Amino acid sequence: MSQDFWFLLLPGFSVMGFVSAVEPLRVANRFHADLYRWHVLSADGGPVLASNGMSVNSDGALEPLKKGDLLFVVAGFEPLRAVTPALVQWLRKLDRNGVTLGGIDTGSVVLAEAGLLDGRRATLHWEAIDAFQESYPQLSVTQELFEIDGPRITSAGGTASIDLMLDLIAQAHGPQLAVQVSEQFVLGRIRPRQDHQRLQVATRYGVSNRKLVQVIGEMERHTEPPLTTLELAERIQVTRRQLERLFRVHLDDTPSNFYLGLRLDKARQLLRQTDLSVLQVSLACGFESPSYFSRSYRARFAASPSQDRAVLPLKAPAATPPGAPAGHRTPRAERG
């Protein structure tokens, strides 16, 4: 008996994340006919415009699904632009009816907004994780490629959707079929869920010095509150002068200026992806002085935090999450 996979495409969705989820199902059917069926939905039943400008036709709107089906919300930039009370109510009804719910790329944001990730592990695209954590601090978010936690299945999007589907194929029909499918995509290996979403520090920054890689990792993990240069040096067991020399020789920078850049980059993401105030963003990135934050931000991005902030459209509030008091409004988080 075929298993039905449904993909709800939201405007601005990632084509890579979507296609990487569908293609493994298609290839699995080449080896064993009719294992899977897949369908595309949109909020209004019409075509959906992806982030790259492509238009994808849908098979229907928010229709009833049956127990045992899988529904993935596929999103990308600004997923909450598409969230409406009708969508939230539909997702909750699917959950009550035994449909497994998932998110691809930033689809997890929509599930969180609907109150459907409470008590479950979830992941999403690395670029949106900081904003997600700030907007939904009560939820358990990881940096894994994908998460399967009971009736919730989430993927970071991109090629991680392939790894997720290979895992689901292996669970349902055995690892050998998953290997056969992976070989059709010329994959060197099937990545486990705990693989890193991002390239290693050494690759991202073009450095090979072990101590330098370690200290950049410490900086990325401690943006609030930030560590002092002396504390950073102590953590990698070098002197302050040795640490400063490492940055000068390999990055033509100082530790403090490099660290400041990391924190400002995080601040920019939060400004563009959340409803946090400028003050809240500055505090979340380790800036105790709002004026220093604004000056530093303008120096790096040639715009003030308020000028650089993405404009979030007003929309009707989503339905109240289960068990929440009247008037509750879940914080927003958007990738982009």
Curated annotation (Swiss-Prot):
Region annotation (Disordered) ranges: 305-336
- Which GO terms of the molecular function aspect are on file? DNA-binding transcription factor activity; sequence-specific DNA binding
Record note on disruption phenotype? Cells are incapable of growth on carnitine.
Q: Which domain of life is it from?
A: Bacteria
Alphabetically sorted, this entry's keywords are:
Activator, DNA-binding, Transcription, Transcription regulation
Q: What does this protein do?
A: Induces the transcription of the PA5384-PA5388 operon in response to carnitine. This operon is involved in the degradation of L-carnitine, and allows P.aeruginosa to grow on L-carnitine as the sole source of carbon and nitrogen.
What is the official name of this protein in its record?
Answer: HTH-type transcriptional regulator CdhR
